[in-house]
Amino acid sequence: MTRPQAAAEDARNAMVAGLLASGISVNGLQPSHNPQVAAQMFTTATRLDPKMCDAWLARLLAGDQSIEVLAGAWAAVRTFGWETRRLGVTDLQFRPEVSDGLFLRLAITSVDSLACAYAAVLAEAKRYQEAAELLDATDPRHPFDAELVSYVRGVLYFRTKRWPDVLAQFPEATQWRHPELKAAGAAMATTALASLGVFEEAFRRAQEAIEGDRVPGAANIALYTQGMCLRHVGREEEAVELLRRVYSRDAKFTPAREALDNPNFRLILTDPETIEARTDPWDPDSAPTRAQTEAARHAEMAAKYLAEGDAELNAMLGMEQAKKEIKLIKSTTKVNLARAKMGLPVPVTSRHTLLLGPPGTGKTSVARAFTKQLCGLTVLRKPLVVETSRTKLLGRYMADAEKNTEEMLEGALGGAVFFDEMHTLHEKGYSQGDPYGNAIINTLLLYMENHRDELVVFGAGYAKAMEKMLEVNQGLRRRFSTVIEFFSYTPQELIALTQLMGRENEDVITEEESQVLLPSYTKFYMEQSYSEDGDLIRGIDLLGNAGFVRNVVEKARDHRSFRLDDEDLDAVLASDLTEFSEDQLRRFKELTREDLAEGLRAAVAEKKTK
């Protein structure tokens, strides 16, 4: 007999001796119960024949669950079950188990379950990548082993706090063959949901782990998480009751004790984006903090808003004074941000702005573009512009006006408010002042002052009317640091605006064709009257300036559609053509003198009927 053969034979004898000392009968021999001898014999067997997988598994059976033993068993996996089958030892007699380090002991009954047990121990040893690769290489044939692979992969994700992956491993609808795996998986899914801030769903899912108390450790985790969910939603008394229950079940459950000792103790919340941003997928500390993630996201959105605001402002026709004022405020804001970054003092300034001029001259558009710029400069949190007016805020009683104003302003915090026709806030005709207007103004004043770092108020209206309204409350006048004037569009600007609005939908309005509108545009511009407050009101103001021009273009398109509704149109619709000649396209793009003249007539007629 060669030396290797002798060593293998000695290893088998040691294996038999170890099994007998473990209380397992072999070949009819009477077993004993001597764990120390069993462990020594199994160790001897693996030393003599490292390729005997069952000897390594026997060491697990004897209580040596070190990672080295599992590594040895996996290295010898080709001989899995050979020795026990040779000796006639059944699976019921020889059933090594390994703790997953969290909830369960995993029985090793197959090559795939050995891989799972080894992966669980690797994960406990923080050798996450090795565990993941081992699980990825496992292709279980038996449904029970397939469940075990899913479970251990869930354990790996749970240990590394990859919460979306935990939820993917333990979907609620899955029917588990092993109820213990289901309970432990539910506990991990509960923690995942709570850590992602889905508290109500986490609280509900926890019941799967708690009911029946199949896995006490899983039930403890689920109860603890329920308690923390209650704390996060402000139900502290109920939270403490659950935490005490956990502590009474397991006094060694440290998180419950910490949560009871410290009412400010909370779960660490995260989100899928932060988890995916990790530089090491297995290390939660390699991810940017939630604050850093939010800052990066905000910076990206800020750049977008700034670019959009600049583009919208630059695309507006005319309004050079308004553009200059906005650019000045933007420059001042940027300088103040730089001063703050350098540690220099920065005066607290408001950006509340009066936009004075007739309707339809771009006041709302400027307010929206400016708000986006302020978002881009991180002065405001959101590009929201809440449009309101006296009519929208009034209620049946004076208290309604105050309440409606407060609710509107609360919703606008972080963004802006656009008060249309702000000069109507305070109306004449009341013997002791306008109580409704005063209620709105007083509430507005509080927010303009106390929230000037997170709210911008735009007041729009005619100049002289606004001046008289502001005389009622000098405090309101002082809150507006910027005044921008808007003017009626001149005839040539109205022509340019007509062409610009046509281009928005790839319509063609030539300079020559558009001249049909010039006499009327000039007439509307030259018509003048004065309001009761002394504001100059031109005919084009009464029509609506840009709003009127848009209506002219829309009515002109309607006339073109009627003009084109002929046999040629029917032929185009009936054909299978997908490409058309320039001549064909021109018919559907150009607005003729007749179209524009009819559009003007229809727009004026519509205005007169309103």
UniProtKB/Swiss-Prot annotation:
Keyword Chloroplast carried by entry: no
Q: List the GO cellular component terms.
A: cytoplasm; plasma membrane
Annotated residues for binding of ATP: G357, P358, P359, G360, T361, G362, K363, T364
The keyword S-adenosyl-L-methionine belongs to this UniProt entry's keyword annotation = no
Q: Where in the cell is it found?
A: Cytoplasm
Family per UniProt? Answer: Belongs to the CbxX/CfxQ family.
Quaternary structure note: Part of the ESX-5 / type VII secretion system (T7SS), which is composed of cytosolic and membrane components.
Q: What does this protein do?
A: Part of the ESX-5 specialized secretion system, which is responsible for the secretion of EsxN and a number of PE_PGRS and PPE proteins, including PPE41. EccA5 exhibits ATPase activity and may provide energy for the export of ESX-5 substrates.
Q: What is this protein called?
A: ESX-5 secretion system protein EccA5
Q: Which organism is it from?
A: Mycobacterium tuberculosis (strain ATCC 25618 / H37Rv)
Q: Which gene encodes it?
A: eccA5
